[in-house]
Amino acid sequence: MKKLKITLVKSPIGYKYDQKDTVKRLGLRKLNSTVIKDDVPQIRGMIRKVRHLVKVEEIEE
């Protein structure tokens, strides 16, 4: 199954609450923090919502 490496590259300060909440629910707390998540439609939707704040890489496992 594919995995996604998600890195927070821009601060969510100054953005709407729902975007801040999405970043938090992805597990990203501080700038340049990274999480690895399964490549599922729910996570893709969350990434799409905050695509201007994160960097995404696909990794094989």
From Swiss-Prot:
It comes from the Bacteria. CDD domains: Ribosomal_L30. GO terms for cellular component: cytosolic large ribosomal subunit. Keywords: Ribonucleoprotein, Ribosomal protein. One of its GO terms (molecular function) is structural constituent of ribosome. GO terms for biological process: translation. The keyword Amino-acid biosynthesis does not apply. Part of the 50S ribosomal subunit. NCBIfam families: rpmD_bact. HAMAP family: Ribosomal_uL30_B. Belongs to the universal ribosomal protein uL30 family. This is Large ribosomal subunit protein uL30. It comes from Thermosipho africanus (strain TCF52B). The gene is rpmD.
